[in-house]
A protein has these predicted regions:
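Hydrophobic transmembrane signal anchors and adjacent membrane-proximal interface regions, especially
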Residues: 3-5, 62-63, 86, 95-99, ...
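N-terminal pre-Walker A segment at the start of P-loop NTPase domains
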Residues: 1-19, 71
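P-loop NTPase motor core
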Residues: 61-88, 93-94
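Pre-Walker A (Motif I) flank of P-loop NTPase domains
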Residues: 25-30, 63
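Short coil/turn motifs at beta-sheet boundaries
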Residues: 23-25, 127
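Conserved P-loop NTPase motor cores
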Residues: 16-18, 30-59, 69-78, 99-179
Length: 179
């Protein structure tokens, strides 16, 4: 008897990927940990605007959602806002930028993406899935967001979000603020 592990009926689903082969494949989860003023937000915006695009301005993500208390006051987010509205064509009526951590909105985003993934997998002949990015930036001072034990949508995103093609990137000042 052959004892090698075999893959049984694995469907091959695709989503857009970065043109840079050294970057993590999407959907990806990641944490950027560094003290204040060490360019975490700058790195996040550059990843969104350059690294996870096709080189001609087409994003690897169909939707980008930013949760950051500084999203409306930090000029680093301005180019991302313009990119989402202009390049990606997301209307102003669709909320993508949150200056407060809105658990209900995040749960709704995850729920909608779950439904979208199921619908796209059921569509005959379709191999490409809708890919979204959720960024949680600058909430190190709020234990209800990053340091919440037990049932938490962030725990769910990091453990099972990939099954719905959800990439999640978190930035924090200290590793101890995450749990």
């Amino acid at each position: 008897m052959n004892a090698k592990i075999q893959v049984h009926d694995k469907s091959a689903w695709e989503c857009r990927q970065s043109r840079h082969g050294h970057l993590p494949k999407l959907p990806a989860r990641g944490c950027l940990i560094a003290p204040s003023q060490q360019f975490k937000t700058t790195a996040l915006t550059d990843m969104i605007l350059r690294h996870y695009t096709d080189g001609r301005g087409k994003s690897c993500f169909e939707r980008i959602f930013i949760f950051s208390p500084s999203v409306d006051i930090d000029s680093s987010w301005g180019p991302v806002k313009e990119f989402v509205r202009v390049n990606m064509g997301v209307p102003d009526s669709e909320k993508c930028f949150f200056h407060e951590f809105d658990h209900d909105a995040l749960n709704k985003i995850v729920e909608n993406q779950h439904k979208m993934t199921i619908a796209m997998k059921e569509k005959k002949g379709n191999r490409r899935l809708f890919n979204i990015l959720i960024v949680i930036d600058d909430f190190s001072d709020d234990p209800a967001v990053l340091h919440n034990q037990g049932k938490n949508v962030l725990n769910t995103l990091f453990t099972r979000g990939r099954h719905q093609n959800i990439s999640c990137w978190i930035s924090a000042q200290k590793l101890t603020t995450l749990s």
